[in-house]
């Protein structure tokens, strides 16, 4: 089988490190008619309360944003450290009637963004609770909160690796920020290839075999040769070096061998 044939046979996960990475930034200034969706029966919204950091990390890890808890701790420190009082009015969880927190999103902001836009932050649903309509309901609920907080527009940072979520944001009426549309033009072409979304008609679709990062595909292949029960992996850049973390059905680890 040729390399091209191998790539064509690949099927993307909804959070897939093998896809070429591009940062995507979407925006909407039309907040009057935001789509509304209700949670499925048996779930409810609750705000963040002190001590909920562990639940946030657990949800984001289950959704494959992280492999190791230390990644979640680092992300929390970067975005939310010292902002507990703010989070009590901005961070949502979706909870089962038994009190298990299964999804999260935050009505937040980006201090470096001088446009005054609100930012939809860190949307995630635990893996086993996906495909129930929770994400759409949570997104609409959090967007409504951003509107209540008085933001004139809303931005959403996303990426090609989470292409299913990016397509959902397009369904909500969000569109590429012009500058980002230029800088990540191939990324939007990849997104068009994967979603065929009509909002991306201005972007040339990328041939399917070219949406994949060959280095990441090779890493996944090598890991799977060693760990048949591989679930997913992440590659971190630290001081110019790659750090490869992986999760199997029985635990987590770090790949120490050279590629």
Positions of the model-derived regions?
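Conserved GNAT acetyl-CoA-binding A-motif
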Residues: 146-158
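Short linear proline/tyrosine/threonine-rich motifs used for host-factor recruitment
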Residues: 233-234, 242-248, 255-257
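Conserved acetyl-CoA-binding loop of GNAT-fold acetyltransferases
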Residues: 169-179
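Conserved acetyl-CoA-binding loop-helix of GNAT-fold acetyltransferases
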Residues: 122-125, 131-148, 170-171
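Conserved beta-strand-loop-alpha-helix junction that forms the acyl-donor binding cleft
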Residues: 156-166, 182-189
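A conserved beta-strand-loop-helix scaffold within acyl/acetyltransferase catalytic domains
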Residues: 61-123
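A short beta-loop-alpha structural element at the N-terminal edge
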Residues: 44-56
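Acyl-donor-binding surface of acyltransferase catalytic domains
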Residues: 1-41
């Amino acid at each position: 089988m040729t390399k091209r044939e191998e790539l064509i046979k690949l099927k993307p996960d909804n959070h897939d490190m093998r896809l070429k990475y591009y940062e995507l930034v979407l925006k909407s200034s039309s907040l009057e008619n935001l789509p509304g969706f209700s949670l499925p029966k048996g779930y409810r919204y609750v705000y963040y309360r002190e001590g909920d950091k562990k639940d946030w990390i657990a949800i984001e890890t289950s959704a494959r944003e992280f492999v190791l808890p230390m990644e979640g701790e680092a992300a929390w420190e970067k975005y939310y450290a010292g902002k507990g009082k703010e989070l009590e009015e901005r961070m949502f969880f979706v909870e089962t009637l038994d009190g298990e927190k299964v999804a999260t999103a935050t009505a937040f902001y980006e201090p470096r963004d001088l446009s005054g836009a609100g930012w939809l932050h860190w949307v995630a649903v635990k893996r086993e609770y996906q495909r129930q309509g929770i994400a759409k309901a949570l997104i609409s609920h959090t967007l409504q909160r951003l509107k209540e907080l008085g933001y004139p527009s809303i931005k959403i940072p996303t990426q090609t690796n989470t292409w299913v979520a990016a397509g959902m944001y397009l369904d909500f009426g969000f569109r590429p920020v012009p500058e980002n549309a230029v800088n990540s033009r191939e990324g939007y072409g990849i997104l068009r290839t994967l979603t065929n979304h009509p909002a991306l008609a201005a972007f040339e679709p990328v041939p399917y075999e070219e949406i994949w990062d060959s280095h990441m595909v090779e890493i996944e292949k090598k890991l799977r040769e060693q760990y048949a029960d591989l679930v997913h992996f992440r590659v971190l850049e630290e001081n110019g070096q790659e750090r490869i973390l992986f999760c199997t059905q029985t635990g987590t680890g770090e790949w120490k061998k050279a590629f």
